[in-house]
Amino acid sequence: MVTWGITALGHDASITVLEDSKILFAAHSERYSRIKNDEYLNEQIVNDALQYGIPQKIIWYEKPLLKKTRQIYAGQWSEALSNKNLPKNYLKQFFDFIEPMPEIKYVPHHKSHAAAGAYTSPFSKATVVVLDAIGEWDSCSVWKYDRSITASPLKKLQSSRYPHSFGLLYSAFTQRCGLKPNEEEYILMGMSAY
């Protein structure tokens, strides 16, 4: 089964193509568009991914409707009420030649991060810690990974939720230092040695 993992409409859009559990293709949109942290896919990256097969399933990196509940809580009404940022609406432009469109499975943002770390590691058992600015609601989560549990090898043990976020605090310090949040945190990290 050909499956595509897609992230877009936030920052750093990318596509990974898998057949069963083998990675066939992976690319960042910014490599094609030359736009740093490009949030959108483009025809070229999609066409390159299509060379490995039309997806039977698309795995989307977050749960957009759950994210909208947090946006409403935070007062981000225009984002929360927009239909443009719904993956199914957005992806139609790339899959207008397929009827019906491939099934989209939405995976929690932090589970996407945890899976990327766990499934690409050499360990069969691990504790996975995800710490970022924010997912749908989670800002920090701890996961138990056990490859021998084939049905569900990742299990969330604990999480911290918005508005409590080390990642947002880190971005705020980045901005306070005159740097661009969600992009130049690495500069602040480098400065911390001094």
Annotate the PLM regions.
Residues 1-194:
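Short acidic/glycine-rich loops and adjacent helix/strand connectors
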